[in-house]
Amino acid sequence: MTNTSRQSVLETLNLQKTYRTGFWLNKKIESLKNCTLIVHEGETFGLLGPNGAGKTTLLKTLLGIVRPTSGRALILGQPIGDRSVRQRIGYLPENAYYYDYLTGWEFLQLIASIFQIPSSVQKKRIPELLDLVGLDRKTAQKKQLRQYSKGMMQRIGIAQALINDPELVFFDEPMSGLDPIGRYQVREIIQSLKQQGKTIFFNSHILSDVEQICDRIALLARGELLCVGSLDQILGRADVYQVIVQGGREDQLEQWILGLHWRDNFWHGQLQGEPDAFLAALSSMDARLISLNLARASLEEFFIDQLRQRGMTSSQ
């Protein structure tokens, strides 16, 4: 596999998954096409893509739930499916089905017992996790899971994914179905895990959340990785200035501002030229600066543009 200066916790090389369908199994669906990527220790990595892009298939392949048709993958230095690795990773599925007659506390005890965590450790670990994910301890002891809201279920799901204190955590659509407050709280949990040095790999189609918390991202569409990198690498550095000016003459401002237009009693546009020179020239134009901000394309704009270039839409 690829050598890097930073330690990698996850690597894939030409990973491919093909399903056979039809009565005679003579039709092929390529769910993953030669996916190659690296996730480094301690980073938060976001996998983006429209519905049906293959995000969950890739994640389940990495977890050993789905067997790849071809290609290779390493997790924590071992081949996917290695039993010793399973003790060191956590997983939150998108659509989790828990035994809902258990209380939240009993459920976490069950998961802890699967990992053979001693009772003495459980007594300390479970309250810590409940505090981390924002679930009341008494509620977790008394209330059955079938009485939990969507947000509470997501929190208990995150807690079970962390019960074994994993080095690498997989989240499948952790913000799915949550209201803005719930999404904010899950983002805060992920940021807390990041500060603890955990490596986080998650799927999402909520681009604003990914943009706020990820160190690097990958865009997956129709099973193919279209790009992998940091936001600066993918979107480019923010070296374009958006300017808003009050007053001044249009013919003079046009020499400095590209796409000059009048809106809400101000001139708006994109600065061409050096900011210092523009600021020095403002007084001679009898104009006053309202704002001058660095700007770049949003992740959403980039995402839609990449899909359109390839004739793809989010509904496909």
Give a label for each model feature.
Residues 1-18, 25-28, 309-316:
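ABC-family P-loop ATPase nucleotide-binding domain
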Residues 5-7, 42, 238, 264:
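Sequence-level motif detector for i,i+2 pairs with an aromatic at +2
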Residues 10, 17-202, 207-208, 212-221, ...:
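ABC transporter nucleotide-binding domains
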Residues 13-15, 35, 260, 292:
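Generic beta-strand hydrophobic packing signal
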Residues 84, 235-238, 307:
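Short, flexible helix/strand-to-coil boundary loops that buttress conserved ligand/catalytic motifs
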Residues 187-272:
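ABC transporter nucleotide-binding domain
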Residues 240-310:
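Short, charged/small-residue-rich alpha-helical element at the C-terminal edge
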